[in-house]
Amino acid sequence: MAMYEFCGTFSVFRPSPVVEALLESIDSSDLLPRSFGWRRVKSSSGRKTDLWRREPLIELGELGQFADAMKSERGGRRFARAAKRVTGVTASPFEVQASMLFSTQRCKGGEGFSGLANNERIPLSASARRIYGKSTCYADLLFDVPNGASPLIVECQGKVVHDDYDSAISDSDRTTALQQMGFTVMPLTYRQISDQANFDTVRRMVARQIGVAYRSKSPKEIRCEIDLRRNIFIDWTTLGR
């Protein structure tokens, strides 16, 4: 999870009251440029959140090179295995959790779905641009489906930035534009993955869309899934403690 955050375009940071007051003072006095590197995410209602946008701290390729160089050190092989499980550049804890649930091997508690990439850039066709009003969009989770079937895009609908009317309209236009280009788009909410019963329905839907015959998990795989879920559905501000 830490590797995803290092390679991602987000950080989770909850300022103390003292730091919060200092940030407000700096913001109101314009002491720092608006693009100083970190940008705080606000909800559609203007509420400040603990989610921040920034450039990746380390590139995926750099992580892989470091992991290879550390293999001979204590814990190095385990570190290298973990690095290989990072599916791409994510933009939120929600995307990390969904990616880990879908891509982690079944023997490690996940679904073992292959062909998953994160935040893939998709240039829009002329007709799709007319619908969405933009020339490019990014797929939260993109499954490359074999045999010429429609690629599956799973869109993580986080409540922070998707909880008002304007966001709903924008999401709808974006979905329509992608569907016009032949993509299958599946909206995903946090509740659908955090609730295990709901997620059972979701994973079967994803399996069907990517052409995988879903096989029910063995008792051992179920225990591994419980362990995985316990480890990833945490207060992200406590990660690494």
Language-model regions, residue ranges each:
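Nuclease-adjacent, charged terminal/linker segments that flank catalytic cores
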Residues: 1-66
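Surface segments flanking catalytic/ligand-binding clefts of nucleic-acid enzymes
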Residues: 46, 50-241
